[in-house]
């Protein structure tokens, strides 16, 4: 098999080979239609003339006429063929793109499927011709139609005639019988073969490969191609060399592109590389352009190299190698900034593709994972590799090579750390800025109060931080895992000393410069399981801790003399980021966003007084970023007053809770004890936060400010006493069932006579009971009441007095009525119920819009056929006044009876409510009195409404 792996420089065709055979078919069909229908059609306007469908429908009708003539002349042969029987309806005046044009094209498609039995594989749709897409199927459909029509005497294009000629040659070679239907056809002159072989050799000889694609001539127009010796038929169609492929045609140029490895750009047509013939493979590399390059074995001598420069060039060969750990380490450790020219990637980038491909054949072992990465390195530009800011060589260091460099001398690994810190400075500045921008803007207010003080200290202590970091950094860097690992793309900077130097330079630039230098790349450290010793720079890269996640441990943040919450929270991040001198330091990470805390075993074992205190001079620039808060304006004296008032109030509240829980509800001792413990803890916290260093007052953590003028005497006494009594029993009152609970006839008189006296007596007893309960509560509590509680009690008393006065007036009016009407009212009240009436809306919509039947009395009906009439006679309305008087009397009596019964039931409910000794009974009495007035108003309204209706009826 040939070993061609390239392509030619110049195209062997005037246009794309995939469209050349379509152009040849279109040219042949245009000439065929021009001769047959005398149309001015060429290749350029082929679609424009046929898109309205009229020419296609005419051609279909013409084929049908030829089929009918053939059936008349050759009836015995017509039985073996499928002939069309009907034509196509068409519209000659159809405009392109209109619905009439679409109808013409649709009729032609249906005729092809039904009458000519053309398969859907080579059929087209209406949209293909209207929108000029899928041109290939349109041309194939016309060729198939011409092929089928040529069987019964229809003139055919040149391609169909060449097909018939080739079929005749095959029949003669295979000694097959001749065609059964010798139908006379109008033939056209075919092209001769005198220039065919010359044109074929011209196309094939353009390949400059040492071993060319074989194409051997068997006879005129017949060749054997490739190593498989496939027999193909070649013909000349005007200016194109056509090849008979399967059931269709193709150009020779396109055929060579698909089958010749020199032209083919697909990986499926590439020959497999054999390990046994490596020496032959090197010399058989195919390129089109020649270039003199130095040889690999002897640079003084030059050799000719063929360089591939075609747009459809094949990809470099993919080599599958087995994994080798030693080779991985040598490849990954060989990339450095100083040895760029000596590295394999740099050499491969300078050598031409020919040498690079030949070099890659000799290697046998490579990791499957590294093949993709090293492939990108081979195709890298040399200038891009030389640039220290953008290159892939930094990302392919293995952990084993990094460990071997770290375990060397201090000079070597400090130099490497300097290189990495300088090359990754832009990334880390961008990362800090992005992390700061993502933080929430709202934080605790007291952290911002210390920000101004920290800024003053930072300028004086920056040099101290650098010196301490240099000393600590050299002692804390250790390598605990030197096992060979897979090459990691994300590198951990090894030297903390240079990082601190870079951190100091970064502080002076400011936050605004960091925002401008944002980059999309990020720096990640390796797993904390594999490498527990982290550097100062990596801790600085972490996300700042939120105040809610700070661990207030007594073993870490307690002072002997003075301890401030502001110092604890402000210097928490610095204690987290400070490297420890001890070798037992461990790093704890709970996630990406959680703070990292260093636990020192030696410090935790020491007593509280011996533990190291947080130093104010160790603040850094990261604290400024964490403490971006807006301070609240407050004086130190105001803070002292606030803390004192809070302490006094909490103490008094705890005492009140203890006293109330012992006297009233001994079951809640545990809850009171828990609240007492909580109060003591809050007292400790408030006392600790009240102490601030350097005479500065801190802001409370909760951010709540209480007025110092407030009296802290009895703040929770009434609330606690009310809650300790338990749930208060309330009386359920159903307003709707008042009328149904009317007493019997005999009890109405007794209730009417004794009603007035009972209300007065009950009112006096209720007031006495209320005064007694209030006095006992005031004596038992012996505490001052809040203004809101006093106002509430006064409001309740006023409500009760007003309700009593209203009830007395209502009862007096009821008793002042005539005693003669009472029996009649009682009789009427037992059988009557309040009339239901709907509330009239403000705007009544049209009856016909609501689709309701209008309930209006019909007018006079004078039609003679409608008898008797629906309109009542006016005589019946003359007796209305006598009826109206009776109706009015009955309604007034029922109204009086309902009023008496409602008042009686209301008094009973009031007496029961007063005896229950409920302080909130005034609210319920107001609720009782309100429905009474509401009941009165609808009745009077109904009475007036009924009168107006009767008056209107009498007027009619």
Swiss-Prot record:
One cellular component term from this protein's GO annotations in UniProt: cell projection
Principal location: cytoplasm
Source superkingdom: Eukaryota
Polar residues bias (residue ranges): 332-353, 381-390
Gene3D superfamilies the record matches: Calponin-like domain (1.10.418.10), Gas2-like domain (3.30.920.20)
Domain GAR: 191-263
Membrane-spanning intervals of the chain: none
PANTHER family associated with the record: GAS2-LIKE PROTEIN 2B, TRANSGELIN
Protein name, as recorded: GAS2-like protein 2B
Organism of provenance: Xenopus laevis (African clawed frog)
């Amino acid at each position: 098999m040939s070993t061609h792996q390239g392509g030619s420089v110049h195209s062997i065709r005037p246009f794309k080979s995939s469209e050349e055979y379509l152009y040849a078919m279109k040219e042949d069909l245009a000439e065929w239609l021009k001769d047959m229908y005398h149309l001015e059609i060429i290749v350029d306007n082929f679609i424009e003339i046929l898109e309205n469908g009229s020419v296609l429908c005419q051609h279909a009708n013409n084929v049908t006429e030829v089929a009918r003539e053939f059936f008349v002349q050759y009836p015995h042969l017509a039985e073996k063929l499928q002939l069309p029987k009907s034509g196509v309806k068409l519209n000659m005046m159809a405009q392109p793109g209109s619905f009439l044009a679409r109808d013409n094209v649709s009729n032609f498609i249906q005729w092809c499927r039904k009458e000519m039995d053309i398969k859907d594989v080579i059929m087209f749709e209406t949209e293909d011709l209207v929108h000029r897409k899928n041109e290939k199927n349109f041309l194939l459909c016309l060729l198939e139609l011409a092929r089928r029509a040529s069987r019964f005497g229809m003139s055919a294009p040149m391609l169909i005639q060449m097909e018939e000629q080739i079929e005749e040659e095959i029949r003669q070679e295979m000694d097959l019988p001749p065609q059964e239907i010798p139908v006379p056809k109008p033939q056209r002159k075919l092209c001769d073969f005198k220039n065919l072989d010359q044109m074929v050799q011209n196309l094939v000889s353009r390949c400059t490969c040492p071993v060319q694609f074989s194409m051997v001539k068997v006879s005129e127009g017949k060749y054997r191609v490739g190593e498989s010796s496939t027999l193909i038929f070649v013909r000349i169609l005007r200016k194109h060399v056509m090849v008979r492929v399967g059931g269709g045609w193709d150009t020779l140029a396109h055929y060579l592109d698909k089958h010749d490895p020199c032209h083919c750009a697909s990986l499926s047509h590439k020959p497999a590389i054999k390990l046994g013939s490596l020496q032959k493979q090197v010399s058989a590399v195919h390129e089109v352009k020649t270039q003199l390059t130095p040889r690999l074995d002897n640079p003084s001598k030059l050799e000719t190299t063929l360089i591939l420069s075609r747009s459809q060039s094949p990809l470099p060969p993919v080599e599958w190698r087995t994994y080798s750990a030693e080779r991985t380490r040598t490849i990954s450790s060989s990339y450095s900034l100083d040895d760029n020219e000596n590295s394999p990637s740099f050499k491969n980038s300078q050598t031409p593709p020919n040498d690079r491909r030949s070099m890659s054949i000799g290697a046998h072992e490579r990791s499957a994972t590294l093949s993709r990465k090293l492939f990108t390195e081979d195709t890298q530009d040399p200038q891009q590799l030389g640039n220290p800011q953008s290159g892939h060589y930094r990302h392919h260091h293995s952990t084993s090579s990094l460990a071997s460099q770290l375990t060397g001398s201090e000079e070597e690994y400090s130099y490497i750390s300097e290189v990495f810190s300088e090359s990754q400075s832009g990334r880390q500045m961008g990362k800090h800025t992005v992390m700061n921008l993502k933080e929430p803007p709202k934080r605790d207010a007291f952290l911002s109060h210390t920000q101004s003080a920290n800024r003053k200290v930072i300028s004086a202590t920056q040099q101290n931080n650098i010196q301490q970091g240099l000393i600590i950094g050299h002692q804390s860097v250790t390598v605990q895992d030197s096992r060979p690992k897979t090459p990691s793309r994300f590198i951990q900077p090894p030297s903390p000393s240079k990082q601190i130097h870079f951190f100091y330079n970064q502080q002076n630039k400011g936050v605004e410069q960091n925002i401008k230098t944002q980059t999309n790349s990020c720096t990640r450290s390796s797993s904390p399981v594999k490498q527990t010793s982290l550097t100062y720079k990596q801790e600085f890269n972490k996300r700042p801790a939120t105040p809610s996640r700070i661990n207030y441990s007594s073993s870490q943040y307690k002072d002997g003399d003075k301890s401030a919450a502001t110092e604890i929270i402000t210097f928490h991040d610095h204690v987290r980021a400070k490297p420890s001198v001890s070798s037992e330091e461990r790093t704890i990470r709970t996630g990406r966003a959680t703070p990292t805390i260093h636990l020192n075993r030696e410090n935790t074992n020491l007593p509280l007084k011996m533990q190291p205190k947080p130093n104010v001079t160790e603040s850094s620039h990261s604290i400024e970023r964490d403490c971006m808060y807006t301070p609240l304006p407050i004086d130190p004296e105001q803070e002292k007053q606030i803390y004192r008032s809070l302490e006094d109030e909490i103490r008094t509240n705890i005492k009140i809770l203890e006293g109330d829980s012992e006297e009233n509800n001994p079951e809640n001792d545990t809850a009171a004890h828990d609240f007492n413990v909580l109060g003591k803890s809050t007292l400790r916290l408030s006392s600790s936060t009240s102490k601030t260093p350097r005479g500065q007052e801190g802001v409370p953590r909760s951010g709540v400010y209480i007025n110092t003028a407030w009296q802290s005497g009895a703040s929770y006494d009434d609330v606690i006493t009310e809650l300790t009594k338990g749930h208060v029993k309330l009386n359920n009152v159903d307003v709707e069932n008042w009328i149904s609970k009317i007493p019997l006839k005999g009890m109405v008189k007794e209730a009417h006579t004794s009603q007035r006296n009972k209300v007065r007596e009950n009112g006096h007893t209720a007031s006495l009971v209320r005064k007694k309960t209030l006095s006992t509560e005031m004596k038992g509590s012996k505490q001052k009441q809040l203004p809101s509680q006093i106002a509430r009690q006064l409001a309740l008393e006023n409500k009760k007095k007003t309700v009593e006065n209203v009830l007395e007036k209502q009862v007096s009016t009821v008793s002042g009525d005539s005693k003669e009407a009472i029996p009649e009212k009682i009789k009427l009240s037992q059988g009557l119920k309040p009339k239901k009436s709907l509330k009239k809306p403000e705007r009544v919509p049209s009856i016909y819009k609501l689709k309701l039947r209008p309930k209006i009395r019909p007018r006079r009906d004078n039609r003679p056929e409608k008898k008797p009439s629906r309109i009542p006679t006016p005589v019946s309305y003359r007796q209305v006044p006598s009826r109206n008087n009776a109706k009015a009397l009955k309604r007034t009596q029922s109204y009086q009876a309902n009023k008496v019964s409602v008042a009686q039931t209301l008094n009973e409910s009031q007496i029961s409510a007063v005896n229950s000794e409920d302080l909130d009974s005034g609210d319920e009495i107001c609720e009782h009195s309100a429905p009474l007035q509401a009941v009165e108003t609808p009745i009077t309204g109904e009475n007036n409404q009924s009168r107006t209706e009767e008056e209107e009826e009498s007027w009619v």
